[in-house]
């Protein structure tokens, strides 16, 4: 889908055309799901958050002003939903600070079953705290600028830089320890 087509669909969706929003949903679904899966490492949670993201996007579509790409706007919503989810689960998260080996094995199996490869880097990445994992993923996998990430996560640019630095530092430390 080219930019003009996307802009046309966004405008039609803003005017109440549900078919246009459905087309946007289908176009961006896979991208958003993969982003959330990398972020959460939980397929069911990723699916749930994609649905919530599109619901919020649908409800607040009129507030999309086109200052950024539509996909950036969706990632911003998805990131905030994910971080909100993590805050709600903070007590439980503290008890289970790292992803269990069983969950990682399941994800590795799922990834390899689809013909992809689970690397040592993903192992180390999966152990990062979500506050660090999110900015590292947005910066180094998706290529967003620190400023864009700050807007998406509603944190200061300096905070983004320090979280990316700290996340990479932790990965390097683990790498050196092995």
Swiss-Prot record:
Which keywords are on file for this protein? DNA-binding, Sigma factor, Transcription, Transcription regulation
**Matches recorded under CDD domains:** Sigma70_r4
Query: What is any one GO biological process for this UniProt entry?
Result: DNA-templated transcription initiation
Q: Coordinates of motif Polymerase core binding in the sequence?
A: 48-61
UniProt xrefs under InterPro entries: RNA_pol_sigma-70-like, RNA_pol_sigma-70_dom, RNA_pol_sigma70_ECF_CS, RNA_pol_sigma70_r2, RNA_pol_sigma70_r4_t2, RNA_pol_sigma_r2, RNA_pol_sigma_r3/r4-like, WH-like_DNA-bd_sf
Entry keyword Transcription regulation: yes
Q: What induces it?
A: Positively autoregulated. Induced upon nitrogen starvation.
- This protein's source sits in the domain of life called Bacteria
Q: Name one Pfam family in it.
A: Sigma70_r2
Could you tell me which residues form the DNA-binding region?
146-165
Residues annotated as transmembrane: none
- Known SUPFAM superfamilies for this protein? Sigma2 domain of RNA polymerase sigma factors, Sigma3 and sigma4 domains of RNA polymerase sigma factors
Q: Which GO terms describe its molecular function?
A: DNA binding; sigma factor activity
Function recorded in the entry? Sigma factors are initiation factors that promote the attachment of RNA polymerase to specific initiation sites and are then released. Positively regulates the expression of the sigY-yxlCDEFG operon upon nitrogen starvation. Also positively regulates ybgB.
Q: Which miscellaneous remark does the UniProt record hold? A: Negatively regulated by both YxlD and YxlE.
User: What family is this?
Assistant: Belongs to the sigma-70 factor family. ECF subfamily.
Q: What is this protein called?
A: RNA polymerase sigma factor SigY
Protein source organism: Bacillus subtilis (strain 168)
